[in-house]
């Protein structure tokens, strides 16, 4: 089946660059505002986003995406990729934007929490710019032709802290180590903290590798 990407447009920004990246790759993609009732034509799903965890979850909940992703998309076993904020929303809970200091429920597709980065060496937040990404020993189809230590483009202040270290497929370092790529491989759910669509040739390779993933 020819790849066709559903790109979730929940008003979280960063949509245009993802659409443009797949247009350049010649991959069919559709920017969808509300959850579709018929998903037969879609082979892959991308949840992009920038902004705060609380605002992101508010948007997904109000538009009906939260339940749809868990109840409709996830059971199909088709690949799902979160990018930047989209990766963070895959977590069980997060603290960004909480007025009470209590955690805010996330999609809970990958067990973990979103916490403020704590860089040492007087490094400022947000973490903006190119940084090296180091793959774990877990070999996955996502990392094909991507060497450990290659640079990707980041913009973030919060990071994904996995409950199970095996869900962290790659790390980077900004004064302290943090998760750069996470996954629950058994559910075909993937997340990248950096922006592959803004990471030039290697980012293009990652987006192609995602499209090559099959349903689990």
Curated annotation (Swiss-Prot):
An annotated Gene Ontology molecular function: lyase activity
A Pfam entry, by short name: GATase
Pathway the protein takes part in: Amino-acid biosynthesis; L-histidine biosynthesis; L-histidine from 5-phospho-alpha-D-ribose 1-diphosphate: step 5/9
Subcellular location: Cytoplasm
Name of encoding gene: hisH1
Matching InterPro entries: Class_I_gatase-like, GATASE, Imidazole-glycPsynth_HisH
Protein name as annotated: Imidazole glycerol phosphate synthase subunit HisH 1
GO biological process: L-histidine biosynthetic process
Residue numbers annotated as active site: 84, 195, 197
Assembly behavior: Heterodimer of HisH and HisF.
Enzyme Commission no: 4.3.2.10, 3.5.1.2
Native species: Prochlorococcus marinus (strain MIT 9313)
NCBIfam families, per the entry: IMP_synth_hisH
Primary site of residence: cytoplasm
Catalytic activity of the protein: 5-[(5-phospho-1-deoxy-D-ribulos-1-ylimino)methylamino]-1-(5-phospho-beta-D-ribosyl)imidazole-4-carboxamide + L-glutamine = D-erythro-1-(imidazol-4-yl)glycerol 3-phosphate + 5-amino-1-(5-phospho-beta-D-ribosyl)imidazole-4-carboxamide + L-glutamate + H(+); L-glutamine + H2O = L-glutamate + NH4(+)
Its biological purpose: IGPS catalyzes the conversion of PRFAR and glutamine to IGP, AICAR and glutamate. The HisH subunit provides the glutamine amidotransferase activity that produces the ammonia necessary to HisF for the synthesis of IGP and AICAR.
Record GO cellular component, one term: cytoplasm
Keywords: Amino-acid biosynthesis, Cytoplasm, Glutamine amidotransferase, Histidine biosynthesis, Hydrolase, Lyase
PROSITE patterns in the record: GATASE_TYPE_1
Limits of the Glutamine amidotransferase type-1 domain: 4-216
């Amino acid at each position: 089946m020819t790849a066709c990407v559903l790109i979730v447009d929940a008003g979280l920004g960063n949509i245009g660059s993802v659409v443009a990246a797949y247009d350049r790759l010649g991959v069919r993609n559709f920017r969808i505002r509300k959850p579709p009732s018929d998903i037969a034509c879609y082979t892959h799903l991308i949840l992009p986003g920038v902004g705060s965890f609380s605002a992101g979850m508010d948007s997904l909940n109000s538009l009906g995406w939260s339940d749809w992703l868990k109840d409709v998309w996830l059971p199909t076993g088709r690949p799902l990729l979160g990018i930047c904020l989209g990766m963070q929303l895959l977590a069980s809970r997060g603290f960004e934007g909480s007025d009470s200091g209590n955690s805010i429920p996330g999609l809970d597709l990958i067990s973990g929490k979103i916490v403020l980065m704590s860089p040492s060496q007087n490094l400022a937040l947000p973490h903006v710019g190119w940084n090296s990404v180091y793959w774990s020993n877990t070999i996955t189809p996502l990392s094909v032709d991507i060497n450990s230590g290659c640079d990707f483009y980041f913009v973030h202040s919060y990071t994904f802290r996995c409950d199970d270290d095996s869900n962290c497929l790659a790390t980077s370092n900004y004064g302290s180590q943090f998760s750069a790529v996470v996954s629950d491989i058994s559910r075909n759910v993937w997340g990248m903290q950096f922006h592959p669509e803004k990471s030039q040739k290697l980012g293009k390779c990652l987006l192609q590798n995602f499209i090559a993933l099959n349903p689990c």
